[in-house]
Amino acid sequence: MYKQVKKIEELYDYFYIDGKIYAKMEENCRLKELSLTGEVLWEAEETEIRYNYVNNNVIIFNLESLEDKYTYDRTFIYDRRKKTLIFKGEIKLILFSKKCFDGNILYSSTNENIIIFDILKGEILKKIDKPTMGITLLVTEKYVIKKYDPYIYIYVKSDYSLVRQQNIQDFFPGEEDLSILEIYSYKDTFIIIARVGIVCLSQKDGSLIWKCDHYARTMEIVGHYGYVCTSLSFYRVDLDTGEFYNYNRKYSRLPDFEYNGENHWPSGHRVVYHKGLLWYDVHTSKHPFIIAIDPETGNYQWIHEITSSNRYIENIKFYDNRMFVTDTDYNLFIYEEE
């Protein structure tokens, strides 16, 4: 289905836009624009960049403070196409999570203040001097949702007035391993992945719509189904009803697979939907694998070993009919369809 055409090394989390790769390189922590062959097309003058974000319009990053190495308040914004400087100044913004952005607007909140910032103009739209708890997991049309285990906090997006805080532990009493990992907006509900299970809550009043008492770390939403592939298990949840389906497999366990005469456990943590298949990252004691799973039958359609990696797969993404795979050793593998 896919063949590897390029491996780029020493690269931190990347962004892919208009056929170009934007990434912080490990060598000097300098942000670079790369071609798909790894050629450097542009690089920022600033080094030791801490956090960065790139979209269609801008490149934004920050450096550590000159006074405090644990504070990152030297912020730079460049026009992505022209590479001209839009903004340079001392402002503490939370850039490490893509979930804090909604288009060109950044919703940056800390235990000190809240800053709603236009990254296209380099302009503060609103600053609110009040602390907020936790980490931002979701920005919707109306709300900003943060988590601080075992609570979620739902704020009005425009002014960060608190709508509701809710203890997710109430739905899983006695479960010590509960941890809020992901939150999704689905119709008029929130889907909360809480490690020990999944809950679906009304956005209006927080009431329980349904609950799934099965281990979950991640979910891939396709239509009205949520697909969970965690450790060795694989199952599907109907997001309207909460109906659980494990493909008639005991303990929802995926079958072992054989590759080049060796048997492997299909242990991984996430599936990604693309062109009718679920693409699953698999960890083994030697090399990682990618398995394409039919979401209707749960059967394997394609198995590929990444022999040039000895680490875990971090992410699988698809852009312009190419597959991009990163591992935990800062490598990016680019695949093209055969």
Identify what each model region corresponds to.
Residues 1-91, 118, 122, 126-128, ...:
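N-terminal "mature head" segments of proteins
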Residues 107-210:
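Solenoidal tandem-repeat scaffolds enriched in leucines and small polar residues
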Residues 35-38, 79-82, 118-122, 157-160, ...:
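Short loop/turn segments that connect beta-strands within beta-propeller blades
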Residues 307-338:
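Blade-level signature of beta-propeller repeat domains, shared across WD40, Kelch, NHL, RCC1
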